[in-house]
Amino acid sequence: MIDDDGYRPNVGIVICNRQGQVLWARRYGQHSWQFPQGGINPGETAEQAMYRELFEEVGLSKKDVRILASTRNWLRYKLPKRLVRWDTKPVCIGQKQKWFLLQLMCNDADINMQRSSTPEFDGWRWVSFWYPVRQVVSFKRDVYRRVMKEFAVTVMPMQEQAAQRQTPAYRRKRG
């Protein structure tokens, strides 16, 4: 499903743990990394597509996560000309995305990138919140920067709380 401007409706998923780190996934058989994402099927809402993609790409279900936020607006990126499939109609020149910030509510061991018969990813790791902005392919970088800036207001307090839990409390000596 491509809109009149040539953009494919899509959802992007940022999964964070209790420390405010985000799940960074390696594309199957490649050296490139990204957040899980995928197309919205006809008749499907963005939230329904997000849960479907979450299961297909990461092996998690609705009970394994909690929605913390979603982007206010659709965000777009254009594909480099070398990646556009000019022989298909309608021609898709890029993606327009609704992004979701999810908190992982289950164990890391429940993440299963191999649940689908055609996996999108073959590995993953937790990375610092801003790491993906510097590491994603260049044509997605502006969208990632905007997504992370919007989600930072939700994740930064989580990181501060995690740091406080890790900092030992010092008691004053009585003399």
Curated annotation (Swiss-Prot):
CDD domains: NUDIX_Ap4A_hydrolase_plant_like
One record GO biological process: mRNA catabolic process
Pfam families cross-referenced by the UniProt entry: NUDIX
Cofactor: a divalent metal cation
Family: Belongs to the Nudix hydrolase family. RppH subfamily.
Function of the protein: Accelerates the degradation of transcripts by removing pyrophosphate from the 5'-end of triphosphorylated RNA, leading to a more labile monophosphorylated state that can stimulate subsequent ribonuclease cleavage.
Name of the protein described by the UniProt record: RNA pyrophosphohydrolase
